[in-house]
Amino acid sequence: MASIDFRNKINWHRRYRSPQGVKTEHEILRIFESDRGRIINSPAIRRLQQKTQVFPLERNAAVRTRLTHSMEVQQVGRYIAKEILSRLKAQNLLEEYGLDALTGPFESIVEMACLMHDIGNPPFGHFGEAAINDWFRQRLYPEDAESQPLTHDRCVVSSLRLQEGEESLNDIRRKVRQDICYFEGNAQGIRLVHTLMRMNLTWAQVGGILKYTRPAWWRGPVPDSHRYLMKKPGYYLSEEKYIARLRKELQLAPYSRFPLTWIMEAADDISYCVADLEDAVEKRIFSVEQLYHHLYHAWGHHEKDSLFELVVGNAWEKSRANTLSRSTEEQFFMYLRVNTLNKLVPYAAQRFIDNLPQIFAGTFNQALLEDASGFSRLLELYKNVAVEHVFSHPDVEQLELQGYRVISGLLDIYQPLLSMSLNDFSELVEKERLKRFPIESRLFQKLSTRHRLAYVEVVSKLPMDSAEYPVLEYYYRCRLVQDYISGMTDLYAWDEYRRLMAVEQ
């Protein structure tokens, strides 16, 4: 196995206007400080404050948004990174692993990957994703792309429909249809950072948010060796060349992951499990006492010094022992959070170190907190109680259904842009308004300038005389609509839907 040298992974160069020459430790740290500034000051991060964590359209500021959740993940990620570096230092391994001059960048990459990990999520979270994918599948029918005879293809878009005698073009059509129908928040995050926001981050920093390594256009079985790493789409066809370059710069084998991404993932797992339960109590879905009993019964067999007693039981007893200075509710979650972090962070750090050869190679085919240990069982306990008692609550389900309808409705409203012919839409893009298309002109004007420019730039580079042009133009037109709607906040999407459906009070 190749030696572990993080100097080959923590690549401080950029796609554009990259720093040149040999850099000192301080100069490299400044490059990653620049990344931090670009990320923290980006509109994509600000929009997280009005995007759903669990409870859509929530007016109670004490309940988490995507932004407050991401800040908590950032803190836990920093904690895990510091724990890893501290343990490696104690074993005199920092220099051997090429980290002695890169501890600052190591921490910074993890922190900013944690802060960015949700930036591609659409309004209303997973229900927004489902709405986008269902809407496009009902029109593009990606499953029919393998149909025989080709006349069975139900795709409603003529340029994407399979044609006899056009096998090479049909392959592209299949790829495009699959890609469009697999919108995914992590893949959209890569698209935001590179294509839409043009943040020009270092290769290492972008590698930190490439959580899944399966391209969205993938068809067929996934290799067992990468089943976990490829369980969801990680990037789109539109970013294929960029990801190929990223892999080269970070020395990543096909479908392998950047090492520090495992830390971001563990931080997210630790953070949201406790946070979702705390938000449910804040929303009065259940009381702290009811939550404790849910956790107690879901754990199963109890022993005196079990992990449950050391973490959950200890938090419950301490919160009941002193109710003078703080409420039981507040104290319980303070102790639960502290106890959980004190157990899971060192464990995650040690798992990273113990599996470092595979993690460095990018092939470790599971999460750090996904094993047969009691620590993994504790996380599963939190998740299972949330699924059974929070996500299935009628109020939560009603809001999710409303969110699904809002996103589906917005796609219906913007559908005329996708129904235009290639020539008509090209003319609309050029002139911005066409008298013979009054509705389409007004819809086009509502699209953000950033998204329109991204469409124009990529389509202008396509060879117009090629047979692929109509297929790829329509692909990027679909991306244009998806970019715009997925970039909305929950509240903006809700308000926009009500305005355009003429139900505004």
UniProtKB/Swiss-Prot annotation:
Keywords: Hydrolase, Magnesium. InterPro entries: dGTP_triP_hydro_central_sf (IPR023293), dGTPase (IPR006261), dGTPase-like (IPR050135), dNTPase_1 (IPR020779), HD/PDEase_dom (IPR003607), HD_domain (IPR006674), PHydrolase_assoc_dom (IPR026875). SMART domains: HDc. This is Deoxyguanosinetriphosphate triphosphohydrolase. Homotetramer. The keyword Hydrolase applies. It is an enzyme of class 3 (hydrolase). dGTPase preferentially hydrolyzes dGTP over the other canonical NTPs. One of its GO terms (molecular function) is dGTPase activity. Belongs to the dGTPase family. Type 1 subfamily. Residues 66-273 form the HD domain. One of its GO terms (biological process) is dGTP catabolic process. Its EC number is 3.1.5.1.
